[in-house]
């Protein structure tokens, strides 16, 4: 499984608009981890909105509290249990006031821990895995009746067939960019990764279902759509003709939807990057010139131990083909340092591949054994002090590459989608085609506009710019 870790370090509470009246029940959703969890939280909120639940950002006001959890990083479960301890106190205080609070744990920690959550955190009323969110309203109803529920079996039915479509007002409240999950699960079984055990086998949504959801999003004002999957380029969904489509063909179809001006996808596995998908990067102006393509390590010996089933040379040849098709593309990746058995020479191979690719940005982590994965049982675990030193060196190199990429854009003109107000008064923030935050004065246009700007400076992870033209309605 490949996981885009852009939001891995953040935890956000999800505010979802609904159509229920002010007197109806309220739900608070806290989201941990990746973009797919953000999408899942939105869909859970949509399902609950259909049952009269209105979203709130204030946990003290909530009748239902849901933690949508991530299990990728070390101690993920302990972080959840700590949060549940705080929620237990809140639940007890509300009970003294005669106010009922239902507490639920969803996501990958729920799938991995199951009934153990109820044992360790008695304040929890329901535990629900990622494949059964469509059952959430009925599960909540049962929990309100006093039942303790663990719903982590893989559903026979497809949850996407049963989840209600979000209300137009809810979509509008989420902004002009959106996520859309097209693929779930993983069949790769990398030895460091827990996802095949928490998300299950690879499943691809059919074309008609994806297109219908994308059209609804576009009609509600979404201008940039990011397709999500644990291995999104492994997507092979049923087309309208009953035949199997690949991700490249799907992108060509989505590019036909009026109002959708920008397309992205994440996260990909090198083994599933086929010619049709590379052609989409070459031919589709709506497909942004940015690709997150993790390699994890630069040593063939470590790649084999990780069960990646490709070599460093395979990866570099693939990068060459992609760049030949789309010369302006910026590459991103993931790296794990300190995998069991990693030697100094293996680590230098990783540093070499980073220099060879020259990433616009990338994410790097110390290896942490995940219970139940083959890597956790391997010998030659690398000492933490060695991991720390290697990670520091790798991150310094990646930071320098990111800084150089940002500075290379100074003086150029780009099309910028204005997404939201900036942190400072009088500013707006958008995203460059290469995914960097770009800050501009608010007189550049309205949120949802695509404007021509000139990059004036680069600082940290962000770019600064000035207007260079007028707002455009569509590409």
From Swiss-Prot:
EC top class, as a word: transferase
Catalytic activity, as annotated: N(6)-dimethylallyladenosine(37) in tRNA + (sulfur carrier)-SH + AH2 + 2 S-adenosyl-L-methionine = 2-methylsulfanyl-N(6)-dimethylallyladenosine(37) in tRNA + (sulfur carrier)-H + 5'-deoxyadenosine + L-methionine + A + S-adenosyl-L-homocysteine + 2 H(+)
Complex and partners: Monomer.
Record region (Disordered): 1-20
Domain TRAM: 407-469
Protein name: tRNA-2-methylthio-N(6)-dimethylallyladenosine synthase
Protein's organism: Chelativorans sp. (strain BNC1)
Subcellular location: Cytoplasm
Cofactor: how and how many bound: Binds 2 [4Fe-4S] clusters. One cluster is coordinated with 3 cysteines and an exchangeable S-adenosyl-L-methionine.
Keyword Transferase applies: yes
Keywords of the record: 4Fe-4S, Cytoplasm, Iron, Iron-sulfur, Metal-binding, S-adenosyl-L-methionine, Transferase, tRNA processing
Record PROSITE patterns: MTTASE_N, MTTASE_RADICAL, RADICAL_SAM, TRAM
Subcellular location, principal: cytoplasm
Keyword Kinase found: no
EC number: 2.8.4.3
Residues binding [4Fe-4S] cluster 2, per UniProt: 186, 190, 193
Family recorded in the similarity comment: Belongs to the methylthiotransferase family. MiaB subfamily.
InterPro entries linked: Elp3/MiaA/NifB-like_rSAM, Methylthiotransferase, Methylthiotransferase_CS, Methylthiotransferase_N, Methylthiotransferase_N_sf, MiaB_methiolase, rSAM, rSAM_horseshoe
Role this protein plays: Catalyzes the methylthiolation of N6-(dimethylallyl)adenosine (i(6)A), leading to the formation of 2-methylthio-N6-(dimethylallyl)adenosine (ms(2)i(6)A) at position 37 in tRNAs that read codons beginning with uridine.
């Amino acid at each position: 499984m490949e996981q885009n870790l852009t939001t891995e370090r953040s935890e956000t509470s999800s505010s979802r608009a609904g159509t229920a009246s002010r007197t109806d029940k309220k739900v608070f959703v806290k989201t941990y981890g990746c973009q797919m969890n953000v999408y899942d939280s939105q869909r859970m909120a949509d399902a609950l909105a259909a049952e009269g639940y209105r979203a709130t950002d204030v946990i003290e006001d909530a009748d239902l509290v849901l933690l949508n959890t991530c299990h990728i990083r070390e101690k993920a479960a302990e972080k959840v249990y700590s949060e549940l301890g705080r929620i237990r106190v809140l639940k007890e205080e509300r009970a003294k006031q005669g106010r009922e609070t239902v507490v639920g744990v969803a996501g990958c920690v729920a799938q991995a821990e199951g009934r153990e959550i109820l044992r360790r955190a008695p304040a929890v009323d329901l535990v629900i895995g990622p494949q059964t969110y469509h059952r959430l309203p009925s599960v909540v109803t049962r929990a309100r009746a006093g039942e303790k529920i663990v719903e982590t079996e893989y559903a026979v039915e497809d949850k996407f067939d049963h989840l209600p479509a979000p209300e137009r007002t809810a979509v509008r409240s989420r902004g002009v960019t959106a996520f859309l999950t097209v693929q779930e699960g993983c069949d790769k079984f990398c030895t460091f990764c827990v996802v095949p055990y928490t998300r299950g086998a690879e499943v691809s949504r059919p074309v008609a279902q994806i297109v219908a959801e994308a059209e609804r999003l576009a009609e509600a004002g979404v201008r940039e759509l990011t397709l999500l999957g644990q291995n999104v380029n492994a997507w092979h969904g049923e087309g309208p003709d009953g035949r199997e489509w690949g991700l490249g063909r799907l992108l060509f179809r989505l590019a036909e939807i009026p109002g959708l001006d920008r397309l992205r996808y994440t996260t990909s596995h090198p083994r599933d990057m086929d010619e049709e998908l590379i052609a989409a990067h070459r031919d589709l102006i709506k497909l942004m010139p940015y690709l997150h393509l993790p390699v994890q390590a630069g040593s063939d010996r470590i790649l084999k131990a990780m069960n990646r089933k490709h070599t460093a040379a395979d990866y570099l040849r693939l990068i060459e083909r992609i760049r030949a098709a789309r010369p302006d593309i910026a590459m991103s990746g993931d790296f794990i340092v300190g995998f069991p058995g990693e030697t100094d020479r293996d680590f230098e191979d990783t540093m070499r591949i980073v220099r060879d690719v020259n990433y616009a940005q990338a994410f790097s982590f110390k290896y942490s054994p995940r219970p139940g994965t083959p890597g956790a049982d391997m010998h030659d675990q690398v000492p933490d002090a060695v991991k720390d030193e290697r990670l520091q060196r790798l991150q310094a190199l990646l930071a320098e590459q990111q800084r150089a990429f940002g500075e290379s854009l100074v003086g150029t003109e780009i099309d910028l989608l204005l997404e939201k107000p900036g942190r400072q008064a009088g500013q707006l923030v958008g995203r460059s085609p290469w995914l960097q935050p770009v800050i501009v004065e608010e007189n550049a246009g309205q949120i949802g506009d695509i404007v021509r700007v000139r990059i004036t400076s680069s600082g940290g992870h962000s770019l600064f710019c000035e207007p260079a033209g007028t707002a455009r309605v569509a590409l």
